[in-house]
């Protein structure tokens, strides 16, 4: 059975990926690691094996990997897009310094390394519709710059040293468990909370601004799927486009109204996040992921909306 380490385990994806990996591989085969003290974390992370570690501390991370004979690492440490614009130097240090440390350790210890890229790796010159797997990127955010550099680093370490690097380009991720963490696509999570609590939402992204989105169950499916895939089928290896649904604010509002008929929405545009959103594609072409490792999402906008409202209503309203 695989021994798996998840670094950045307390983030939006990690906090849900860890329980899912433990369900699949067994609680004792999945180690969660994060900078935070265990007392700050959800029981789902610390009930199993947990190690406190800074990804920039190479010796500490290497010690953990050796201690548990780790076969696969999911690297989920990152400062997200809007936070990265406020702290660009820190974004570079964490996003790329942490990745470089893991790549160097992987070169020595020979484990699989999953590092996600993002829709944020694209820029204004990128084709907006059905964005190809291989195309011009040229992002305009520091987050995007670190993601493109990360894609290239992972390719380099595979070609130069044979490190088994794998990854996908995630769209905006929508979760019913974890709160948003400073991303441009966070409106598509916030809107459900406000719809349930206030039946109204003030949106910071303009009407008509399309972005690729994905429900968390499909996000986990993509991460685990590419790590379990037969790499002999790969033409690409890192940064596979994975898509699920593309919508703009009016469409998500309409989907919510099907469940909460008196829901209303107005706008107060955030120029920083709007500018980032406009630089990204409307929809990615994920045909390479479908062909090379059988990627297929399970949720569309309506089925996700029904599930989000059902789950969040129980939690927020005790229904």
Region locations from a protein language model:
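Conserved Rossmann-fold NAD(P)-dependent oxidoreductase catalytic core, especially the SDR/UDP-sugar
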Residues: 75, 100-142
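SDR active-site strand-loop-helix element
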Residues: 7, 33, 73-79, 113-119, ...
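N-terminal Rossmann NAD(P)H-binding glycine-rich loop of SDR-like oxidoreductase domains
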Residues: 4-24
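C-terminal substrate-binding subdomain of Rossmann-fold SDR/epimerase-dehydratase oxidoreductases
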Residues: 204-206, 211-319
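NAD(P)H-binding glycine-rich loop region in Rossmannoid oxidoreductase-like domains
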Residues: 55-94
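Active-site helix of classical SDR
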Residues: 146
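Rossmann-fold cofactor-recognition segment
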Residues: 45-56
